[in-house]
Amino acid sequence: MVKNIKIFLSLFFVVVLGLLATTANSMVIGIDLGSQTFKVSLIKPGAFETVLNEQSGRKTISSVGWFKDERLFSSDSFSVWARNPKQNYNLIQAFLGIKYKEGLVEEISNGLPLGFKVKNDTVRNTVSIVYDDDTNYSAEELTGMLLRRVKDMASSYAGSSIKDCAITIPPYFTQQQRQALLDAAQLAGLNVLSLIHDVNAAALSFAMDRTFLEKNESVIFYDMGARHTSVSLVEFESHNEQIKGVKKNKTVSSASVKGIEWDEKLGGFDFDMVIVNHLKTLLKKQIPSANVDDIKITIKLLKEVGKMKENLSVNQQAQIFIGSLVDDHDFQATISKQQFEELSQSLIERSLLPLKKLILSTGIKLKDIEYFEVIGGGVRIPFIQQALKDYLKRDTLDKHLNGDEAMSNGAAFYAASLTHYFKVKEIKLKDILLNSVDVEINNNIINSGGAGETLLEETEDNEDNELNNSGNEQQQQQQPTINQGGLKDKKIQLFKVNSKLGIKKTVSFSSENGFSLFLNNPTINNPLATYTVSNVPTPGEKYNFTGKPKIHCSFRLTTSGIVVLEKAEAEITVSLIKPQPQQNKTSSSTSTTKKNTTTIETTDGGSEETTDETTTKQQQQQEKEEEEEVVVVEKVIEYIQKTIRVPLNFTIKYNGCVEPLSKELSQESNDRINKLDQVDRILRELRQERNNLESFIYETKDKLESNEEYLKCSTQQERDQLVEELDKTSAWLSDALDNDNTETEEYRKQLKDIKKKADKIVNRVSQYQLVPVALEELEDTVDKVKPMFEIASKDLNVTAEELKETTDKIQSVSDWVQEKKSEFKLADYSKDLQTSSFDIKFKLYDLERTIKEILKKKKKPVKPSSSKKDKSSKSSKGKSNSTDEKDQKQKEQKEQQQQQKEESQFQNDGAEEQQFEDDHKVHDEL
């Protein structure tokens, strides 16, 4: 508990106190999309928290499926897994962005009971997941459904729609798998700011509440999830930087990933299957007729094994009991902690291999490891922890992080840092590429350049490489020239292993023709894409140049680990005519204007400018003579050389690769999911109305039988009649449940009808409860009004008759209250009361209105004394008596304050009066 509080406080100070949001809806989420469960962390102004699901759980099962044509998610889907394994889909993320092959499901499941089938999607060269004979879904669609559920859950929890997010991925995901996940997120309506390796998201969580000013720290993060194990070495460093424009320093931290290793087929599920296989052996002995390979039996065993594994973490043995596991046969068995460890020996050895590889590849010494953080559900197994301690020669393993939520917290922090509306602690994540990328250039340019011509230019992308995009660091550039032997081998290592994510590289060479660029992961033989570049400029009318154009192809390695060709340009040096300075023609123009005008005297002695035919002929003759006198000077044309870059067109093909969702396919998938969402909404409304009707029937029956108030407020005959009507409605409901065609509106109409029949008794019960309360309220008001009115009435400008009338009305209401209280005590509650709560409310309203109206009467005018009258008449001829005026104003102010004080007793009654007027209208209608 204390540890969780510390974690919460650290997140609070890191994010909440350092968080500036510019808009009301500024929110981001981090999604840890695990194979078994997913966790979601939310950052919004003033809060950094884990999103709770409908059951108030902090983690949710990653499952989607159908049962009786109804789509189900998470625990609902998981609960019917054994009953409908063919249409319940687990481990869907493992099918993202992979090619189809025979036995794929068995290979991915690794013994897990996946009951669905897959087919070959020949259009996109990937897998298609079978729903029935006529319907298939892509892995992107099913994952998109799950992510849309995540989005809706987070938006409901936050109270506002959320789109921006970061999603964790295993480090071994290929570019096709990463792109497929991005496509799935787009179908869900999410804006993925970046993907992030899950183990490195945990590293960000580690750095959020720490600084490393004293020394750099090397930390290994060991994450064993449900399906894979990954290990990362991260070096943390902090330094102080001066804030621009302010004489203050800020602390900037960095998390540099030095290496990552993994086992993509080792996780907590594998240890579960060890126990499942052991139980199958015992089951076969107990019930020889049992088919232990039956998928439904395997699923039932697997559901119980999770609890057994938890028990073995703290106890020496665990038991299992499943009733009617095989036909009518029950199954009961036990397994000890020692047996579990012995059966898992090969897995224990495998659990150390990624760690050994990491230490070997990075060259780090065990003594230099400051912390060894363990996260994920798999490391809760005691003998796994012991094996790690023995290898590391440590007495304890570090557990500073929440093993379940560190990844989602780190992803949310990462997402917030990539937005413009959050300012968080400055931590620069320097993640790395885990598989090198080569680019191969086609045969058209084998002999296009000389040795050493190809240039590989590297540029750091400040826009999305650094966690905090403060812009403090200048753009770094490296321009190493790589001798490709005149491109004879045509291959260039574009990005090597451990290249920093978020950088750009430009490949430059000379070519006269179009060409193709083939991207590939050579270490895992994974083709990525083929870019065909065209419209390379040639010398002609449009471009006046000589020689071969120099081609520049700019590739970007995104923070999500995806390589794309951003642009291709041809650099050429063209000859342009040097612009000549323009001559000043103002004087000649003025002169010409003067030549083309003549002055004609008018009869009134004025002058007028005109251009008649005679004048025009004279001007033409004069201009002709002037042109003959012009000396012809030869114009010299000068040329200048200018280097320009011409954008080139390119297309992309995925020959032999898994294709991303095209715009058209994405729209089709989105439409399919929207239709399913609409069906879900209709089913929810139908179920809600059905439940409302069913609840009303049962609750009303129960009240008629045992509720004291209902028994008082009804006769036996009325109760019997209502019960009979309820039974009829119940019979209708029973038939409707068997009829799948019953519409939502029919349930709604049945509920309305039965409520109308129950209104007589329900209203009596309501009045039985409301009348005493209303009488008490009215009596309390009268008790307060009496003394207040006696005081206030002395200063009112009212007649004695008006005063008596109001006083009598107050007393009349008081007497009426006492009369109705006595009447209520003696009333027959099985009949309608003579006085309702509306009547009492009207009395209250009428009394308050009367008091307010009389308090608005003006005060009696103060009569001035005779001496003051004399002084006043005298002062009218000169200056007024300022002292008397001042006294008079003060007295008037006091009187006004007194009046306001008296009226303030009723100043809040306006809203109540309006409400009561509305109620009274309803009462009149009734």
UniProtKB/Swiss-Prot annotation:
The cross-references to Pfam families, in alphabetical order and at most eight, read: HSP70
Keyword set for this entry?
ATP-binding, Chaperone, Endoplasmic reticulum, Glycoprotein, Nucleotide-binding, Signal
Give the InterPro entries listed for this entry: ATPase_NBD, HSP70_C_sf, HSP70_peptide-bd_sf, Hsp_70_fam
Q: Where is this region: Disordered?
A: 458-485, 579-628, 857-926
Q: Where in the cell is it found?
A: Endoplasmic reticulum lumen
The signal sequence is 1-26
Just give the chief location class.
endoplasmic reticulum
Q: List, in alphabetical order, the Gene Ontology terms for molecular function in this entry.
A: adenyl-nucleotide exchange factor activity; ATP binding; ATP-dependent protein folding chaperone
Which residues carry attached sugars according to the database record? 120, 136, 216, 249, 311, 468, 544, 584, 596, 649, 797, 881
Keyword presence, Endoplasmic reticulum: yes
Has the keyword S-adenosyl-L-methionine been applied to this entry?
no
Ranges annotated as biased composition (Basic and acidic residues): 882-904, 917-926
Q: Where is the composition biased (Low complexity)?
A: 467-479, 582-605
Q: Which family does it belong to?
A: Belongs to the heat shock protein 70 family.
- Alphabetized PANTHER family for the sequence: HSC70CB, ISOFORM G-RELATED, HYPOXIA UP-REGULATED PROTEIN 1
- Describe the function of this protein: Probably plays a role in facilitating the assembly of multimeric protein complexes inside the ER.
| Entry protein name | Luminal-binding protein 1
Q: Which organism is it from?
A: Dictyostelium discoideum (Social amoeba)
